[in-house]
Curated annotation (Swiss-Prot):
This is NADH-quinone oxidoreductase subunit K. Keywords: Cell inner membrane, Cell membrane, Membrane, NAD, Quinone, Translocase, Transmembrane, Transmembrane helix, Transport, Ubiquinone. It is an enzyme of class 7 (translocase). NCBIfam families: PRK05715.1-2. Its EC number is 7.1.1.-. It holds the Pfam family Oxidored_q2. GO terms for cellular component: NADH dehydrogenase complex; plasma membrane. The keyword Translocase applies. GO terms for molecular function: NADH:ubiquinone reductase (non-electrogenic) activity; quinone binding. It catalyses: a quinone + NADH + 5 H(+)(in) = a quinol + NAD(+) + 4 H(+)(out). Belongs to the complex I subunit 4L family. The keyword rRNA-binding does not apply. Coiled coil: none annotated.
Amino acid sequence: MTGSDLIGMMILAAGLFAIGLFGVLARRGILFQLVALEVALSGPALAFVAAGAYHADPQGQGMLILVLTLAAAEVAVGLALLLRIRRTAGSDDSDVISGMKG
């Protein structure tokens, strides 16, 4: 992998992170926010793999496995909370949830 390949991958990783962050901030539905958070987490994962490939170091792939594991745990907890909130509030809109007391 050349330096220009690494720069391209880092730009792509930053773009994925920015798109995911925008999705988390712009959408009100919790399900869409979870999907956007997954897109945001794929950016740093791509950066880890690209940096590891550039330096011929397998630690980048190890970090990818860690990021994917954390993302899977985040989705599991997020979906469980989403189901509970939908039963309680009747909606998955984050504005409705912020007004809940208790």
